[in-house]
Amino acid sequence: ARPRVGGAVSAALLLAYAGLKVGDQISLFSFAAKPIGMTPAYMHTQDFPALQRAASRIDYAPVESNFTLALSTLGAELNRRSLIILFTEFTDATSADLMIRAAGRLVKKHRLLFVVIKDEELEDEERRRPESGSDVTRANVAAAMLRDRQLVIARLQRLGADVIEVPADAMGAHVVEAYLGIKRQGSL
């Protein structure tokens, strides 16, 4: 999970720079079991080093993310309609359900884009040709987990959230493209 956090932070910084270049207000918010930090809203590219410093403090935490607390805290901090971009993975059905409920409250006022990091190991496991009984079991478990993941994505989309699934090694380009697409729609 640690390399994925680093990839998400790098993608968030690329996105922040793109947002500053087009004149948007940009803030970083991070959380794990509780909110960790939120930067002020920055508007100019010369403010980018402040965002980099804040991002350098974001690290992997071996705890369950508390989406309910984090998203309600974030919602309370934002006083105008905003585009909220969440980099996430789905680890289990319970945390995914809590995330969906918290997102449901936010999506009423804000535009949400979920950047879901693909689990390529899980996809490989599902596609691997089984050579033993345990291989069949692993493939079936992987297939079930991938189905659950698609159900979570569908629920988020039904709420009105945008969702993109991206490979861990190409998050930046995909998220900037999605952000610019939302900007072109003019729906903020």
Regions found by a protein language model. Give the residues of each.
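Exposed, interaction-prone extracellular/peripheral surfaces
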Residues: A1-L188
